[in-house]
Amino acid sequence: MMAAQPTANPGVRLGWKAPGALASPPRLALSRSAAAPLASHRVGRGKFSAAAITTDDYLPMRSTEVKNRTSVDGIKSLRLITAVKTPYLPDGRFDLEAYDSLINTQINGGAEGVIVGGTTGEGHLMSWDEHIMLIGHTVNCFGTNIKVIGNTGSNSTREAIHASEQGFAVGMHAALHVNPYYGKTSTAGLISHFDEVLPMGPTIIYNVPSRTGQDIPPAVIEALSTYPNMAGVKECVGHERVKCYTDKGITIWSGNDDECHDSRWKYGATGVISVTSNLVPGLMRSLMFEGENAALNEKLLPLMKWLFSEPNPIGLNTALAQLGVVRPVFRRPYAPLSLEKRTEFVRIVEAIGRENFVGQKEVRVLDDDDFVLISRY
C-alpha cells in the first residue's frame, strides 16, 4: 500500500474528501521578454542602440549549435513515437527513477521517439519549469538513443514561443504544437499562431478537436506544409483526413491507436504517436513496421478500447500502476478507473500475454486504498 508522506504536500486517498482542498498551482506564465519593449531599451547613457529591435522585428532565440540538432526529415521518418507517461512520487513530484525506466523500456522495445509532457504525460498539470526540466532531463539522459519531442504548445502564442525556445535550447529534437484551445481563434489566427512557432525548429502540429474544441481545417495544414520546419501532423480526425493529407505528400501520424494499423497500411500514414505503446512497445512496433497484420491489430483492440474507456491518461495511469512499474499516484483531477475496470485489465493482460507488457512484476488488481491522489504539489 502506498502511503502519503505527512508533509505540506499530503497525498489524499481515494474516497476521502479533503475539506477545502486547493487546486494545483497555476502554470508559470512565460513571455517573450520580462523587460520593457526592446524598442525603448537604452544602450549607454542617453543613447538608443542603432540595432534596437522593435516588437515587429522580433528575432527567435535560436542557435545553430543546439544540442542534438536534427533535421526535419529525421523527424518525418519516425514510425513509432510514444506519448510517454510521467510518473510521480507520493508527494506529487516527478519520480525520475521510474521515468528513466519507462524511457529505457521504450528504447529497448523499439520506439523511435517520445513525446514529453504531452496529454498522456500530463504537461497541462505541470508548471513550465517542471515541463522544461523534464524535457532537458530526457535529452541529457536519452537524447542520443531516441528522439525527444517536447510538447511546448499552448493556447497562448506567447507561452508557446517561450516554451519552444527553451525546449530547443535544452536540446529537444522537435516540438509538438496543439492549436489554441478554449479561447479558439480564426483560420487566420491559427496560421498566425503557427507562423510564430515554426521558425524555432522541427515541429509536429497536433489536431485533436475532441480536446481543443476546434478542428484545424485542411486549408491551414496545407498552407503550413510549405514551411521548412513543418515535420507533419498528429491527426485524430480519422482515415479520410489522413488520406487527404498523405495524397498531398504531407507526413501524418495517427493519433488514434485503434485506427493506427489501417492508417499506416491503407491510408499512407507514416506511423503512430501512441499511448498503447507505453504498455506493449514491442507489439506496437510490429504493428507499425512489419506490414499489414489484422490478427495482431485485432488482438490489441480490446486493450486500446479499455485504455480510452475514460479520458486519457486515466486508463494508462491505472494500468502502469497495476503492472508495478509506477507508483499508484495520481495528480488531480485524475483518479483511477473503477474496480470493475481494474479487474478487466488483468484479464486483458492474461489474454495478450504478460510477457508482452512492460515491467517484470505480476499484474494485480489494486484496491481503492492503494491509490494516492495529490492536490497540492
Curated annotation (Swiss-Prot):
Q: Name one GO biological process term.
A: lysine biosynthetic process via diaminopimelate
Q: How is its activity regulated?
A: Sensitive to lysine inhibition. This inhibition increase in an allosteric manner with increasing concentration of the inhibitor.
Q: Which CDD domains match?
A: DHDPS
Site label Part of a proton relay during catalysis, positions: 119, 182
Cite the Pfam families for this sequence.
DHDPS
Record keywords: Allosteric enzyme, Amino-acid biosynthesis, Chloroplast, Diaminopimelate biosynthesis, Lyase, Lysine biosynthesis, Plastid, Schiff base, Transit peptide
InterPro entries given in the database record:
Aldolase_TIM, DapA, DapA-like, Schiff_base-form_aldolases_AS, Schiff_base-form_aldolases_CS
For this entry, the transit peptide stretch runs 1-51
Q: Which domain of life is it from?
A: Eukaryota
Q: Name one GO cellular component term.
A: chloroplast
Q: What does this protein do?
A: Catalyzes the condensation of (S)-aspartate-beta-semialdehyde [(S)-ASA] and pyruvate to 4-hydroxy-tetrahydrodipicolinate (HTPA).
Protein name according to UniProt: 4-hydroxy-tetrahydrodipicolinate synthase 2, chloroplastic
Q: Which organism is it from?
A: Triticum aestivum (Wheat)
